[in-house]
Swiss-Prot record:
GO molecular function: rRNA binding; structural constituent of ribosome
Source organism of this protein record: Clostridium novyi (strain NT)
Main function: One of the early assembly proteins it binds 23S rRNA. One of the proteins that surrounds the polypeptide exit tunnel on the outside of the ribosome. Forms the main docking site for trigger factor binding to the ribosome.
Top-level taxonomy: Bacteria, Bacillati, Bacillota, Clostridia, Eubacteriales
Key words of the record: Ribonucleoprotein, Ribosomal protein, RNA-binding, rRNA-binding
Official protein name in the record: Large ribosomal subunit protein uL23
Family the entry assigns: Belongs to the universal ribosomal protein uL23 family.
Gene Ontology CC annotations of this record: ribonucleoprotein complex; ribosome
Length: 96
């Protein structure tokens, strides 16, 4: 089983994800092997908040070319986490 701190890779900082923060919804890139219950427990443990809902999406890495060499970016999983109304906000995103 993955450690809670290893499961959450990084936050997604885009215009769309920042607009969703007004609705108490935060977006993270997570380990591709993680399921929704593991993601919920990890976010609650790491940030000390209450999670209401977790939605996930899995993406295939793009094929990229540099000259004659062809490579592929890594596959990744994105998790959209919605917090409960009585939960505090995640301090990491404050001031962005």
């Amino acid at each position: 089983m993955l450690n809670s701190y290893d499961l959450i890779r990084r936050p997604v900082i885009t215009e769309k994800s920042m607009a969703a923060m007004a609705d108490r919804q935060y977006t993270f890139i997570v380990d591709i092997r993680a399921d929704k219950t593991q993601i919920k427990k990890a976010v609650e443990k790491v940030f000390g908040v209450k999670v209401e809902e977790v939605r996930t999406a899995r993406f295939d890495g793009k094929v990229k070319r540099v000259g004659v060499h062809v490579g592929k970016r890594s596959d990744y999983k994105k998790a959209m986490v919605k917090l409960t109304e009585d939960s505090k906000t995640i301090e990491f995103f404050e001031g962005m």
